[in-house]
Amino acid sequence: MMITLRFVSSTDLMARIIRGAELGFAYQHVEAKMPDGTLLGAHLDGGVQARAADYDTAYVADLYVSVPCSADQEAAFETFLRAQVGKPYDVVAIAEMADGVVTGEAPSWPDSPSWICSALITAGLLTAEIIKAAPATVRLATPRDVLVACSALTIIGEPKQNPGVSTIRS
């Protein structure tokens, strides 16, 4: 069995803030490709949602990563993510990243009332026991942290450039 994660590079303000927190890492967003083809993730606009696969036309590059797991882990990952749909975006976490001020991890992160994209995916991977430990505090995990955690489980491929966008801007 596999779960598929989509890492995305964009040029908007939020992407630039996250890129700074990630020390220039190429991807500023991560979401899960669900079995029905939707992309489930957390965005500033709309919080946690399952969006149509073609919703994102302004990306610069994306990278799909297939992560091996058992059928039970795949089901637990999907169940956890779907239970988060409707929760708002964690704007405070992004502000803390931008300011370099971290208030710490809430001990009840599985029940978080809001999510950033990478914290959502990290929590799903942990809940499903696909990864055994968070690569950073769950609440402030970045897409880079998620990719590093997954790189121990699978071969990471090449990104696909969006032909409609020419470059990644800082």
What does each model-found stretch correspond to?
Residues 2-27, 143-148, 157-169:
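Donor-binding and catalytic core of enzymes assembling or modifying cell-surface/extracellular glycoconjugates
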Residues 27, 77, 117-120:
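Generic hydrophobic secondary-structure packing signal
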